C-alpha cells in the first residue's frame, strides 16, 4: 500500500516525512512486531533520502548493518564504514614478480605471503555496454548498488570472461597500472594501503610495491565497498554487525524529481508557479503478517499478536 505527500517546500516535506515515520512506528508497535529503522538506497524510485523498516529474521531477503555501540543502522546497499589503514610504509619501487598459475586474490595472498589487505583486486563490469575497470583493496568486496549509483547507469552486471579477454585484459592478472581505454573506478581503501600487490596484465606475473595514486590514477574515486561484519562504524568507530531481515515499510523524500518530470506545480501567494515537493510512503500489509509469523512463532506454531490475530 502506498501513500504520497505534497508540500510547498523542503521544510514541509520534512514535517510530512517525520510524521509518516512516527505513524509507521506506532502501527508496527500496535501490530506487536519489532522493527529497526535503517538508512536505505532509494533505488529506481529515486529521491535524496529514504529509510526502511526492517523486521529482523534469519529468513529475510535483506541484509542490514547495525553498530554495536551507537544507533547507526543501514541497509547493506547503503551502509558505510571507517576504513582501517595498513601500517605506514615508505613507498618502494614497483617490481614484476613471476606468479605462475596464480589467478585469485586468495592464491596471490598465499603465494606472496601477505594478507589480502596488501593486494589490489580488479573487478570488471559491463555498465550500459561499457566495460568498467574497478580497483579495490583485496580484503574488501564491491557493493554493486554503490557502483551503479556512482556510474549513474541503468544496467550493471559482471563482465564475462570473454568480454574481459576481448578488451585485451589478462584475467587473474589484470592491472590498473598503465591501463588505457577504460573508465577506472577506485575505492578510497587503496589510499590506506602501501606497497600493494596487483596484476601486471601479463600472464604469470604480478606487480609488487604498487601505490595509489603514485602508480595509477582513477576516473572516479568513490566509496564502492560493501560494509561487512567486523568493520568499523563510520560514526563512533564501534564494531558493525550484520543481520537478515524483511522490509515491511519504506519511506522516501522524493523532492521535486517527479514533479519536474510531470510538470506538477502550484501557484504561491505571489502567483509564482513552483514545483510540488513530494514524499512517497510504502507499507507491506502482507509482509507484516509474514513477518509476525517469522518473529513470533514458537515450537508449537504461530503466535499471532492480538491486534492482527484472525480470531481470539
Q: Language-model features: where?
A:
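Extended, low-hydrophobicity, polar/charged segments
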Residues: 1-288, 295, 299-306
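Short, intrinsically disordered, charge-balanced linker/junction segments flanking boundaries
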Residues: 307-312
Amino acid at each position: 500500500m502506498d501513500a504520497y505527500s505534497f508540500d510547498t517546500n523542503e521544510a514541509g516535506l520534512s514535517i510530512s516525512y517525520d510524521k509518516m515515520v512516527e505513524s509507521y512506528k506506532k502501527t508496527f508497535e500496535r501490530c506487536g512486531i519489532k522493527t529497526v529503522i535503517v538508512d536505505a538506497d532509494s533505488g529506481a524510485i529515486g529521491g535524496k533520502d529514504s529509510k526502511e523498516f526492517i523486521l529482523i529474521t534469519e529468513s529475510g531477503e535483506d541484509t542490514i548493518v547495525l553498530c554495536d555501540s551507537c544507533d547507526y543502522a543501514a541497509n547493506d546497499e547503503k551502509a558505510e564504514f571507517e576504513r582501517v589503514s595498513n601500517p605506514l610504509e615508505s613507498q618502494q619501487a614497483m617490481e614484476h614478480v613471476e606468479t605462475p598459475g596464480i589467478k585469485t586474490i586468495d592464491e596471490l595472498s598465499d603465494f606472496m605471503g601477505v594478507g589480502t589487505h596488501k593486494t589490489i583486486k580488479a573487478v570488471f563490469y559491463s555498465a550500459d555496454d561499457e566495460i568498467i575497470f574497478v580497483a579495490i583493496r583485496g580484503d574488501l568486496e564491491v557493493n554493486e548498488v554503490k557502483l551503479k549509483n556512482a556510474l549513474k547507469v541503468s544496467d550493471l552486471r559482471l563482465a564475462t570472461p570473454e568480454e574481459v579477454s576481448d578488451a585485451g585484459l589478462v584475467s587473474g592478472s589484470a592491472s590498473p597500472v598503465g591501463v588505457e581505454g577504460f573508465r577506472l573506478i577506485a575505492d578510497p581503501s587503496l589510499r590506506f594501503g602501501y606497497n600493494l600487490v596487483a596484476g601486471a596484465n601479463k600472464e604469470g606475473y604480478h606487480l609488487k610495491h604498487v601505490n595509489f595514486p603514485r602508480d595509477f590514477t582513477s576516473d572516479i574515486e568513490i566509496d564502492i565497498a560493501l560494509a561487512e561484519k567486523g568493520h568499523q562504524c563510520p560514526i563512533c568507530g564501534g564494531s558493525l554487525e550484520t543481520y537478515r531481515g524483511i522490509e515491511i515499510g519504506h519511506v522516501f523524500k522524493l523532492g521535486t524529481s517527479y514533479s519536474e518530470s510531470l510538470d506538477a506545480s502550484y501557484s504561491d501567494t505571489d502567483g509564482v508557479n513552483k514545483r510540488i515537493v513530494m514524499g512517497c510512503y510504502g507499507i507491506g500489509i502482507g509482509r507484516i503478517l509474514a513477518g509476525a509469523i517469522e518473529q513470533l512463532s514458537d515450537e508449537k506454531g504461530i503466535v499471532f499478536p492480538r491486534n492482527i490475530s484472525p480470531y481470539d
